[in-house]
Amino acid sequence: MSLLCVGVKKAKFDGAQEKFNTYVTLKVQNVKSTTIAVRGSQPSWEQDFMFEINRLDLGLTVEVWNKGLIWDTMVGTVWIPLRTIRQSNEEGPGEWLTLDSQVIMADSEICGTKDPTFHRILLDTRFELPLDIPEEEARYWAKKLEQLNAMRDQDEYSFQDEQDKPLPVPSNQCCNWNYFGWGEQHNDDPDSAVDDRDSDYRSETSNSIPPPYYTTSQPNASVHQYSVRPPPLGSRESYSDSMHSYEEFSEPQALSPTGSSRYASSGELSQGSSQLSEDFDPDEHSLQGSDMEDERDRDSYHSCHSSVSYHKDSPRWDQDEEELEEDLEDFLEEEELPEDEEELEEEEEEVPDDLGSYAQREDVAVAEPKDFKRISLPPAAPGKEDKAPVAPTEAPDMAKVAPKPATPDKVPAAEQIPEAEPPKDEESFRPREDEEGQEGQDSMSRAKANWLRAFNKVRMQLQEARGEGEMSKSLWFKGGPGGGLIIIDSMPDIRKRKPIPLVSDLAMSLVQSRKAGITSALASSTLNNEELKNHVYKKTLQALIYPISCTTPHNFEVWTATTPTYCYECEGLLWGIARQGMRCTECGVKCHEKCQDLLNADCLQRAAEKSSKHGAEDRTQNIIMVLKDRMKIRERNKPEIFELIQEIFAVTKTAHTQQMKAVKQSVLDGTSKWSAKISITVVCAQGLQAKDKTGSSDPYVTVQVGKTKKRTKTIYGNLNPVWEENFHFECHNSSDRIKVRVWDEDDDIKSRVKQRFKRESDDFLGQTIIEVRTLSGEMDVWYNLDKRTDKSAVSGAIRLHISVEIKGEEKVAPYHVQYTCLHENLFHFVTDVQNNGVVKIPDAKGDDAWKVYYDETAQEIVDEFAMRYGVESIYQAMTHFACLSSKYMCPGVPAVMSTLLANINAYYAHTTASTNVSASDRFAASNFGKERFVKLLDQLHNSLRIDLSMYRNNFPASSPERLQDLKSTVDLLTSITFFRMKVQELQSPPRASQVVKDCVKACLNSTYEYIFNNCHELYSREYQTDPAKKGEVLPEEQGPSIKNLDFWSKLITLIVSIIEEDKNSYTPCLNQFPQELNVGKISAEVMWNLFAQDMKYAMEEHDKHRLCKSADYMNLHFKVKWLYNEYVTELPAFKDRVPEYPAWFEPFVIQWLDENEEVSRDFLHGALERDKKDGFQQTSEHALFSCSVVDVFSQLNQSFEIIKKLECPDPQIVGHYMRRFAKTISNVLLQYADIISKDFASYCSKEKEKVPCILMNNTQQLRVQLEKMFEAMGGKELDAEASDILKELQVKLNNVLDELSRVFATSFQPHIEECVKQMGDILSQVKGTGNVPASACSSVAQDADNVLQPIMDLLDSNLTLFAKICEKTVLKRVLKELWKLVMNTMEKTIVLPPLTDQTMIGNLLRKHGKGLEKGRVKLPSHSDGTQMIFNAAKELGQLSKLKDHMVREEAKSLTPKQCAVVELALDTIKQYFHAGGVGLKKTFLEKSPDLQSLRYALSLYTQATDLLIKTFVQTQSAQGLGVEDPVGEVSVHVELFTHPGTGEHKVTVKVVAANDLKWQTSGIFRPFIEVNIIGPQLSDKKRKFATKSKNNSWAPKYNESFQFTLSADAGPECYELQVCVKDYCFAREDRTVGLAVLQLRELAQRGSAACWLPLGRRIHMDDTGLTVLRILSQRSNDEVAKEFVKLKSDTRSAEEGGAAPAP
C-alpha cells in the first residue's frame, strides 16, 4: 500500500472574476475528497490530501466545480495515471496542468481526458517513500541520496553570486516559509478561506516518537537541528517531504501562505516534533526512550510525521541561500532587535556548556553532530515571539565544538525525565560511519558559515538602522521577570518523545518514601519543569482573564437573504423567499433556525475575527473596546484569582503585571490570529442502524471542519465497520466545530435522482459534533452518535483519533498536559506551601461534590482552564486523584480518593444504553493515558498494601480520625479492585478482602515479632507500675529462658492486648467485608499460630531440663488455656480441631500428678493421725463418718478440680491424665483402707462398738465419694483404663468393707454361741414327739419365744445401737454377718451338734458343711471333710465305740416338735432381722444359704431312713470317682433286669477278679470281696454278699455271682452297689483294703455292664451326704441306718509292715 499526497494549490481560470466560486474534487479508487470553495478567477486553495493506494494501475481524477444556486457545474477535469506520479518524501512546488472538458472511459473506468480548456490548475502530486523499510536499508538509501546531493555541491558557496536566486524550500506543515515573509504572497481573493498574514503556523505536533534518523525542522523552535543526513525512507505514516524536480524551482513560485495542510495526525509528532539529529546513536543513549516508547512508536498506527530537513548538501542550498537572506532581511525589518551586539553576546553566554537542560528530557531532541551549533530562525508574528536563543557570531572550528543547545532563561519545555542523563563525552554524538561524519563536517561547516554570515550581516544592519529600540519587544530579549512570551500560543519545540509522566511514571521511589504517600515526584512531575510552568502560567491567565463562562452568546434575529445564502453551520441553502434563516447582529453569522443552537462560540471574538479579516477596523475597535472592558472588570472583580495564579507559579509582581498586559493583548488578537491543523483518523464504528432492506447498511463517514468536508470509503454490508482513514484539515476559527457524520450509501436510481436535487441523498446514520477549541495534542476517543432531529433513527458509536496543532503551540504540551501542570502546581502550592504538607479538603456537598478539588478560588482556576481548553471533568478527576496519591496518608485523603476513584469507575464502567463500547475501550481512549493510570493504581495499590501491612503504626487505634482513614483506605482498595475488574476487565484481580486480609496478617506477623523481641520492655512500660521492679531483669534474661516462665506470661498479656485492640478498635472500623474479614478473629488466629509455634519449641526445651516447678508449668498451662478458650476456640479454623497446646504441657501435668500423689499420701497420714487422736469422732451430728475421709477427699477433689479446670480439649491427653489420677486415687484410698484394716480388730476387741462402726462408715464413705469422683471424672465416658482402675478399686473397697463387717461380726461370736447354747438347753426341755397338732400351735409359739429369749436380748441391745451409728449400707453388711453367724451357730449347736466336744466334727461341719443349697454336689476336694469324720471316729478307738457314742448322744437328736419350735423361732429371727424394711430384705433372708442349710438340716430330721438313703444315693454321684491313688481294682459284671409284670428289679453281680491290690500285712493276706446294695425299701431283703477269700493273692480271681432283689416302688437310679475288698482275719474284725461304688443309674439305659472299678481309700461325700450321715448316725435304733452309717464311714484300715505283694 502506498500513500498518495496531493496538494491542490491554485488555479487560473479564463473568465470574469465574479463568475467563479470553485472547489476541487479528487477521486481515486472509491475515495472522494473535496476542497473548500474559493471565489475568483485565480483561486488559491492550498489544501493537501492523502490517499491510501493499493492499485497503481488506476488514476487520480481531478475535477474543478463551480458552485451554483441549485446545482454545480464542472469547470474542467484532469486524469493523472498513478504510475506517472513521482516518489518523494518532500513537497514540491507543483505542476501546472490544463483542464480538459471530457473524460475517456474504458470498461466503465476513466482512462484519460480530452478536449482541453483554457483553465489551468497547479497540483503537487507525489507518493511517500516506501513504508516500514528496515532501518539498515533506510540508512543505506539515506546515504546514497546524500552522496548524490553532495555531487552537486562541489563549488564553494559565493554569497555575492547567488543574490537573486530564490530559496527552494518546500512548504509543509512543519514550516510554512511564507509565514515568515519568505515567500511571495499571491493570494488575491480576499474571501479565500485561507489568510495570508495572521497565521502563525510553525510545525506539526504529534504524540508518538518519530522513527530514528528522522529530523524535523522547526523555524520557531528554540533549538534547531540541521541534519547531517537525509531523512530516512519513511515510517509508516511519516509524511516527510523531500525535494524533487529541483529544476522546477528555477522560477520561484510564491508558496501559499497556509502552506500544506498535509500534516501529521495526532499520533506522531505532538510529543516528538523535535528529534535527535541523525548522528545521535539511538542504541547508545537513553534519549531514544525505553522499549515502551518503541512500543508506542509501533502503536501510532494512524499517525504521521511532517518535517522538512535542511540538508547540508541539498542540491540548491548554495544557490538559494541568498534569497533566504533577503527574505530574512525583509522580515527582520519589521522586528525590534537588540541595540547592539553586546546583548547578543550576553545572550550567547547563557548557552550552557553541556546538554543538561535538554538532554535530560526525552521530549527535547538536542543531539547534533559535533560540527554544529544551534541557530534559531526568527518567527513571523511581530511582537509575539518566544524567547529564542541567538546564533553564535562566528563559526568556530567545527571539529572541536561540542553540541550546545541554546538555552535562554526560561525556555518553556515539557517536564524533565530523570531517567535520561546527559552524554558523558562527545563520542555519543558522532556519526556511526566515519565517512559520513567527515562529509558532514566539510559540507556542514560551509553551510553553517554561510548562514551565520548572512544572518549576522542582516542583524548588524538592523541594529544600525534602529538604534536603541524598545527592548521590551526585543526579538532577542534578556532573561528575567519581564522576558515572558508575548504570544502565549507560540512555544519552542519542547515536545516529548514519550507521554509525559504526569503522575505515575516516576513512582519507583515508592517504597523509600512510603510514609508520605507515593513519592512527591510521582504526583508532581511538572513542578520542576520551569518552561512548561511558564507557558501554563500564561495560558491560565488567558483562560481566566476572559473565561468561557463569560463569553457572549450570539444575538440572532430572523433575517431575509436577498441573494442565495448558505447556512454557516450545515452549509445548506437558506431556502425561501424571505425570512429564510437567522443572522447574528453582532458578528453577522447566518444559519438555519434549526442550526442556531449549534453555533455557541463567543460572538465577540467571532466578530473581531471577521472584522479584522474584512478590514472593518472601526467595528473591530468597538468590539475590542468591549473585550477590554470586560477583561478590566474581570481583573477588578476577581483579583484573588490572579494573585493566586501569580503565587502558584512564583512569578514576580513586575513580570506578572507585564504578562497580564500581554495576555489581554492576545485575547484581543483572539481568533483573528488563531489557526490550527487538525488530523482526524476515522478508526471504526459499532452498533450502527440498519437502513437497507437486507438488514444492514453501507456506511461511510464525512468529516467536516469549517467549510472543508472529506469522506471515507464505503464499507459494504457492515454495521460495525472499520475504516482506519486519516484526514487533515486547517482551521482558522477556534469556534469552529468538527462535524463527523455517518451515512448509509445508496447507489440506486432513486438515490441518483435525489442527488441532483438534494444535498443529502444518502441515509443519515448519526453524527457527533466536537468543539475545535477544546482540542489540543491528540485523543483517541469513542463518541456516541447523536440525532440531528427527533425523527432520526440513530444508534452506536464512532471511534476517532484526533490530533491538533494550534499555530504557535506546535511545540508545546497538549492542553491536557498543561492542565496537569496547572493542577499539580496548584495542589503543591495549596498543600505544601500554604498548608505545610497537609491536604486541605474542601467542604462540598451534593452529587457533584467529588468534582470540587479546592477552595472556591483555586477551583475556579482549574474549572475555567478545563472549560476553555476542553479538558474533560474525568481527566480533572484522574489528575486530582494522581495528586492525592502523593499524599494518600494524610488525614481525610483516603476517603476523598476512594470517592474520586468510585466516580472514575462509574464513568468508565457504567456505559450508556446507546453504545456498545466496552468500559475497557472507553478507558483505553482516556486522555489521561491508560498505562499511566493503571501504573498509578498499581503503585498506589502496592503502597496501600504496604501501609495496611503496618496498620497498627500508620492508623493507631487511639486516633478515631486515623481509624476513619483506615476504613477509607480499604474502601480505596475496593475501588481499585472494582476498577481492575470492571474497567480494565481483568479476569480475576486480587479481591480487596483478600488483600486486606493478607495485609492484616502481615501486620500481625510483624507485630508478634515485635512484641516477642521487646516483650519485657513493653510489659514493663504498659503493665508494671512499680518502677523498682522494672530494672530487675537483666537484658540477657529478658527473653525466653529455661530457668523461668515469666517471659511467656508477659507475652500472653501483650498478645491479649493486641487481640483486644484489633477486636474492639479495628474490627468495627474494617467492617466492609463482614463475611470474609474479621480483624479480631484474624488477629487471634495469627497471634495464636505464631505463639503456638514458639511455645511448642519452648516447652520441648523445658521438658529436657525441668528447671521450673511443676506448679509454674501448671499456672502457665492455665494462662495458655484461657488464651485459647477466650480467643481461639471459636475461630472457624479451630472449631473442629483438637488444639495442640495440651500436648505441650502433658509431661508437666503428669509430673504434677506424680508430685500430687505424694502430697496426697502425706496428707492422708496426717489426716488419719489427727482422726485417731480425736478418737474418730463424727464430723457432724448427721454425718456418721469421721473427718479423715473428708480430708482425704478434699485433697483429691482439689487435685481433680485443677485437672478439670485445665479443660483439656484433647480426649487422648485427658485419658492420660485420668489414668494417672485414677492411680493416685487408688493408691491413696487403698492405703487408707489398709491402715484401717490393720488396726480394726483391735478396736473391735475393746468392746467399743462405736469406733469400729465409724471406721466401717469411713470405708463406706470412701466408696460413696469414689463413686462421685468416678462420675465427676466422666462416668461412662471416662477413659477405659482409668475406669477399670476405679472399678477395681471399688471392688477392693467393697471387699475391705465386707472383711471389716465380718471381723466386726465375728467379735460378737462368743456372745452369740453362749446365747445359742442357752437356746439349745431351753429347746431340749421342750417335750413331745411326733407331729404337732394344730391345737398345740400356741404352746409351740410360746416355746419358740422362750427358746429365742437369750439371743433376742443380745441382738436387741446391739442392733439398736448399730442402727444409730452405722451407715445404712454398713448396717446391712453387719446384719448380714450377724445373720450368718446366728444361723450357722444355731445349725452347729442345736440342729447338727458335733458328735462330741472332743471331736473335730464340729469344726469340720463349720468349715465344710454350710452355705450350700440342698442337693448341691461338692467337688472331690471336699473329701477332706469326710476324712476328718473318719479320723475323729478313729480317735474313739473301735467303730463299735462310735456306735456307743451315737447312743450317748441320742438326747441331742431333735424331735419333730422341737423342729417345729426351731422353725417358728427361725421365722421370728427372720422378722427381727427384716425389722419392717429397715434391716435386711426379705428376699435376701429367704434365699440366704445359711437359712436354707439350717432348714434343710431340720427337714432331714423329719424324713424316714429310706428317704434319707435315697437322697444320699441320688445326690452323691461322685463317691467312687476321682481316685487319685487307687489301691487296686475290681472287675465286675453287672446285669439289671426288670420284671415286665411286677416291675420288680433284679441285679445280678458277677465278681470276676481283683487286680493290683496294694496291701501290706505281716500275716497271710486273704482278700475277699464284699458287695452291698444300698437304697430304699431294702429292710426286708438281703443287702450284702461276700466272695470266698483267696490266700496271699494280690490279684485274686473269684468269678462268683450274686443276685439282689430291688423294690418295684423305686427305680434303679435310687440304688447303688458298694464293693469293698477286705482282708479276712480270724478272731478279729476284717480289715478294709479299698472301696468302690457303682451307681445303678448308669445301667438303667444299657441293662448290663462289665467294668473295672478302681478301689479308693474311702467314700467321697459332699455336705449333703455328711448331713444325711450325721442324721442317720443319730438313729441308733434303726438297723438300716446303722448299717448305712457303717458302710459310708468305712475307710481303708492301717497297714501292717511286712510281706511284699505277690507277683
Swiss-Prot record:
Q: Does the keyword Zinc-finger apply?
A: yes
Needed cofactors, names only, are:
Ca(2+)
Where in this chain does the entry annotate a coiled-coil region?
A: 320-357
Q: Where is the composition biased (Acidic residues)?
A: 319-353
CC annotations in GO: neuromuscular junction; neuron projection; plasma membrane; presynaptic active zone; presynaptic membrane; synaptic vesicle membrane; terminal bouton
Q: Where is this region: Disordered?
A: 186-445
Q: Which residues bind Ca(2+) 1?
A: 692, 698, 744, 746
List the Phorbol-ester/DAG-type ZnF regions, as residue ranges: 553-603
The UniProt record gives the binding positions of Ca(2+) 2 as 692, 744, 746, 763
Tissue expression pattern: Expressed in pancreatic islet cells. Expressed in melanocytes.
Q: How does it sit in the membrane?
A: Peripheral membrane protein
Q: Name one GO biological process term.
A: cell differentiation
Any domain commentary? Answer: The C2 domains are not involved in calcium-dependent phospholipid binding. The C-terminal region containing both MHD domains and the third C2 domain is required for synaptic vesicle priming activity.
Q: Which family does it belong to?
A: Belongs to the unc-13 family.
Q: Under what name is this protein listed?
A: Protein unc-13 homolog A
Q: What is the lineage of its organism?
A: Eukaryota, Metazoa, Chordata, Craniata, Vertebrata
